[in-house]
């Protein structure tokens, strides 16, 4: 698929199919789609390799996100056997010497080059380029899409018009609204009716649990762990580049003199971050308790040494040691044999930085300290003692944690064995109802379950700078940052459905469709809904308090829409239990019904996905057009589409009561005679007229008209109507007696108006095949002269045909003022029709008194 040749609509369709964001300019959409395609490519490549040689080891499918194309956090795939170390700069040799890493850099190349590199690969090994025959990978789905593309040399007429019109829409900017916070973007995501794909089962790795390694259960969802469990890196695509990502080791210690090493293998390129982002590449290394979060150094009993040359604990940062960056090796030492204290110190490339922390053993309470790392856009590797030689010299008297007897190591919390043991709690409630407060308290009161809170607030906690939350005085666009955090959350939810953990989904979740959509991927979990529904007075007080603390988070119109659509969950196919925390079910039902009524009264009418005013979209089909305006004609008719490529049912001649469109095919179209068979003011068809690109029929040679017998009664004079006439109303019928045209001969049910005498006469003329004639009231005029308009051929009048005998009905004549009023309204109507200036702008509509439509044609 050549993404650069896709149109904007096609790009959006491809992104929507993958669950990606469809907003942005064409260049951004193409960049996003290319990144998704590159992320999908390794999975297809591995599947083909497995089919070619099923005997190769290590072909377990890597976890790949079901939507969005980004790779899910998990363990990485080892390289095929026989791949030798490749000692190029920026890579590293693994502990067994089989492979080196490089494609961490490649996962973000799409931000700096037009050709998108692989965003997230199964592992960050360095593979020689000649061993990656990506051009041989077969993509049947992509090939099908390429067949549907038009050849680059061919552009239909409408395509060029659309291309010229498109930039004016791309340059429009949405007005900035300061009160678009995290709740607003959660609300927008909940309104989207996506159907999630069922998650694939997580691969079960046969890993020796007695080894000290990175714990895949005690790490962030967006931290990717290699299959050897000694290295990892974070996701960095889009908003993930703002996030810290942490991981802890599987074993800790509480006695002895223990150490481990950490090497920064690469600073991953994140050129999509703004230049104002402070410290886009940082690593913090140290120790923490098993009960601490992954945010190293930002809470008690969490001790870290950062690459900015600072140490931190409980979010208190102090200068310490030297700064460190890519390719530096940091040694971490814990000395439990210093009397009543525990001393933590660090080395940089073998140079001792001094004692960083002294902790009282009583404060620890006999709890073990675990190796811990927190990274931001960096790939790291640990040496717990599995390497034959350390990276750098180790302080005398210290032992690598891997070399300690198993009895002296303390295993961290072990995760659930199956999904049936896992639990997901879905919070349900309006903004500021207290969902986040309840979730934090519940997680703290159940530390053994290690709840992962999935919410925008938790995402923002991982975007801290120097331990401080980003506030609205953030240098960039706050609403853009919040929107990126919401997108990160959506991907984390997809990742979470494949991991055996306990979760709390901290969002509003008031839409019934959102509740169902978010719970279905967690099939097999214990799925529970936690409804926070305070009284209306409490909700108002909490909203005011939250606004004072954080600013206005959700616009009022979004809150009203949530109220109008608030649905209390029920136990059913996607929920095993529903718990009400404040108001119970009966009281909550009454309050929710009140909210529904309040929201429906205050909000706009419900949106319609499709317009019911016509068939098809904008007249592209044969059964009618998607109407740009309301129906203003008689019943059964539509105002017409702008672009009709179909036949009679659209804006062409075959459709009844249409305003008339621009028809590019032969099944209808603008007729040569404007006031002909589909007269605009005809009560039966009410079509304004059609234009046909077909060659004009030449009129017959000029013949003298036969003598006209005097009519028994005057024919119906022209009556005038400025707009669409309802059935039975009077109409202005400009009867034409040109051969080949059909004048309106229907008799209105209400008598029309006859202009006062003396009458006027407009001779018929030919203007480039656009013919119109007027027949004056009796007595009949002499044969009209022929006019020649420049290069247009002379008019050859056809034989005059006398009009049919009129009916015996008489028509009262209106006053001159009424006629002038109708003419003025007719002129005003055509002044508003700026969409068809080539056809109507220079047309002479009679030049009669009171008309402002224009004089004679200047063509």
Swiss-Prot record:
It comes from the Eukaryota. Residues 3-37 form the SAP domain. The lineage of its organism: Eukaryota, Metazoa, Chordata, Craniata, Vertebrata. The RGG-box domain is methylated. Residues 192-389 form the B30.2/SPRY domain. Residues 38-54 have a biased composition (Acidic residues). Keywords: Activator, Isopeptide bond, Methylation, Nucleus, Phosphoprotein, Repeat, Repressor, Ribonucleoprotein, RNA-binding, Transcription, Transcription regulation, Ubl conjugation. Residues 1-103 are annotated as: Necessary for interaction with HRMT1L1. Residues 77-88, 697-720, 776-786, 796-807 have a biased composition (Pro residues). Interacts with BRD7, PRMT2, TP53 and NXF1. Associates with histones and BRD7. Residues 671-696, 745-775 have a biased composition (Low complexity). The modification Omega-N-methylarginine is found at residues 645, 659, 664, 674. Acts as a basic transcriptional regulator. Represses basic transcription driven by several virus and cellular promoters. When associated with BRD7, activates transcription of glucocorticoid-responsive promoter in the absence of ligand-stimulation. Also plays a role in mRNA processing and transport. Binds avidly to poly(G) and poly(C) RNA homopolymers in vitro. Residues 214-859 are annotated as: Necessary for interaction with TP53. There is a cross-link at residues 117, 143, 147, 163, 271, 450, 540 (Glycyl lysine isopeptide (Lys-Gly) (interchain with G-Cter in SUMO2)). Residues 613-661 are annotated as: 5 X 3 AA repeats of R-G-G. This is Heterogeneous nuclear ribonucleoprotein U-like protein 1. InterPro entries: B30.2/SPRY (IPR001870), B30.2/SPRY_sf (IPR043136), ConA-like_dom_sf (IPR013320), P-loop_NTPase (IPR027417), SAP_dom (IPR003034), SAP_dom_sf (IPR036361), SPRY_dom (IPR003877), SPRY_hnRNP_U (IPR035778). The modification Phosphothreonine is found at residue 210. Sequence repeats lie at residues 613-615, 620-622, 639-641, 645-647, 659-661.
């Amino acid at each position: 698929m050549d993404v650069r040749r896709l149109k904007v609509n096609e790009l959006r369709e491809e992104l929507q199919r993958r669950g990606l964001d469809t907003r942005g300019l064409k260049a951004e959409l193409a960049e996003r789609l290319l990144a998704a395609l590159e992320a999908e490519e390794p999975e297809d490549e591995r599947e083909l390799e497995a089919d070619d040689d099923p005997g190769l080891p290590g072909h377990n499918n890597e976890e790949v996100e079901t939507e969005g194309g980004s790779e899910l956090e998990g363990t990485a795939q080892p390289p095929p056997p026989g791949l030798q170390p490749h000692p190029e700069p920026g890579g590293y040799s693994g502990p067994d010497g089989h492979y080196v890493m490089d494609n961490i850099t490649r996962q973000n190349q799409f931000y700096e080059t037009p050709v998108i590199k692989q965003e997230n690969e199964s592992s960050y090994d360095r593979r020689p380029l000649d061993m990656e025959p990506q051009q041989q990978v077969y993509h049947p789905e992509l090939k099908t899409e390429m067949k549907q593309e038009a050849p680059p040399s061919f552009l239909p007429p409408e395509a060029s018009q659309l291309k010229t019109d498109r930039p004016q829409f791309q340059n429009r900017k949405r007005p900035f609204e300061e009160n678009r916070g995290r709740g607003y973007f959660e609300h927008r995501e909940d309104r989207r009716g996506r159907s999630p794909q069922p998650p694939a089962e997580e691969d079960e790795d046969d890993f020796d649990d007695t080894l000290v390694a990175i714990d895949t259960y005690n790490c962030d969802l967006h931290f990717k762990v290699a299959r050897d469990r000694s290295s990892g890196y974070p996701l960095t695509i889009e908003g993930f580049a703002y996030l810290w990502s942490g991981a802890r080791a599987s074993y800790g210690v509480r006695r002895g003199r223990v150490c481990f090493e950490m090497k920064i293998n690469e600073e991953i390129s994140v050129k999509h971050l703004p230049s104002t982002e402070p410290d886009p590449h940082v690593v913090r290394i140290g120790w923490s308790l098993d009960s601490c979060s992954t945010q190293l150094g930002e809470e008690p009993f969490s001790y870290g040494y950062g690459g900015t040359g600072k140490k931190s604990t409980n979010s208190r940062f102090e200068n310490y040691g030297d700064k460190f960056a890519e390719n530096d090796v940091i040694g971490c030492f814990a000395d439990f044999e210093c009397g009543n204290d525990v001393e933590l110190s660090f080395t940089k490339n073998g140079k001792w930085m001094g004692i960083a922390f002294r902790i009282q053993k009583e404060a620890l309470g006999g709890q073990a300290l675990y190796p811990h790392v927190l990274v931001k856009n960096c790939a790291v590797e640990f040496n717990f003692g599995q390497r034959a030689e350390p990276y750098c010299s180790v302080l005398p008297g210290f032992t690598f944690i891997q070399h300690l007897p198993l009895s002296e190591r303390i295993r961290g919390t072990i995760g659930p064995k199956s999904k049936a043991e896992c639990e997901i709690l879905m919070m349900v409630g309006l903004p500021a109802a207290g969902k986040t407060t309840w979730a934090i308290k519940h997680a703290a009161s159940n530390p053994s379950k290690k709840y992962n809170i999935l919410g925008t607030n938790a995402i923002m906690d991982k975007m801290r700078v120097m331990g401080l939350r980003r506030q609205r005085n953030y240098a960039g666009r706050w609403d853009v940052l919040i929107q990126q955090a919401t997108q990160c959350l959506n991907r984390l939810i997809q990742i979470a459905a494949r991991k055996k953990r306990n979760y709390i989904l901290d969002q509003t979740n008031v839409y019934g469709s959102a509740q169902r959509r978010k719970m279905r991927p967690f099939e097999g979990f214990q799925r529970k809904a936690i409804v926070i529904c305070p009284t209306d007075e409490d909700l108002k007080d909490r909203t005011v308090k939250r606004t004072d603390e954080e600013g206005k988070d959700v616009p009022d119109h979004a809150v009203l829409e949530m109220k109008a659509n608030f649905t209390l969950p029920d136990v059913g196919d996607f929920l095993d239990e529903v718990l009400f925390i404040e108001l119970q079910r009966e009281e909550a039902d009454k309050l929710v019904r009140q909210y529904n009524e309040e929201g429906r009264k205050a909000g706009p009418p419900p949106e319609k996905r499709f317009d019911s005013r016509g068939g098809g979209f904008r007249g592209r089909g044969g059964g009618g057009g998607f109407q740009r305006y309301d129906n203003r004609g008689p019943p059964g008719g539509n105002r017409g589409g702008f672009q009709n490529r179909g036949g009679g049912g659209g804006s062409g001649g075959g459709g009844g009561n249409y305003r008339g469109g621009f028809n590019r095919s032969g099944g209808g179209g603008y007729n040569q005679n404007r006031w002909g068979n589909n007269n605009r003011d005809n009560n039966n068809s009410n079509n304004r007229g059609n234009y046909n690109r077909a060659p004009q029929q030449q009129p017959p040679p000029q013949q003298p008209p036969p003598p006209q017998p005097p009519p028994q009664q005057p024919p119906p004079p022209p009556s005038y109507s400025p707009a669409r006439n309802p059935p039975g109303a009077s109409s202005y019928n400009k009867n034409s007696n040109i051969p080949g045209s059909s004048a309106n001969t229907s008799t209105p049910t209400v008598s029309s108006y006859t202009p006062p005498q003396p009458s006027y006469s407009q001779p018929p003329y030919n203007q480039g095949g656009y013919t119109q004639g007027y027949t004056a009231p009796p007595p009949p005029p002499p044969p009209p002269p022929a006019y020649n308009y420049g290069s247009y051929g002379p008019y050859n009048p056809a034989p005059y045909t006398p009009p049919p005998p009129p009916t015996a009905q008489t028509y009262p004549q209106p006053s001159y003022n009424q006629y002038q009023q109708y003419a003025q309204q007719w002129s005003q109507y055509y002044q508003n029709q700026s969409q068809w200036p080539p056809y109507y702008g220079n047309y002479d509509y009679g030049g009669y008194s009171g008309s402002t439509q224009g004089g004679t044609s200047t063509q």
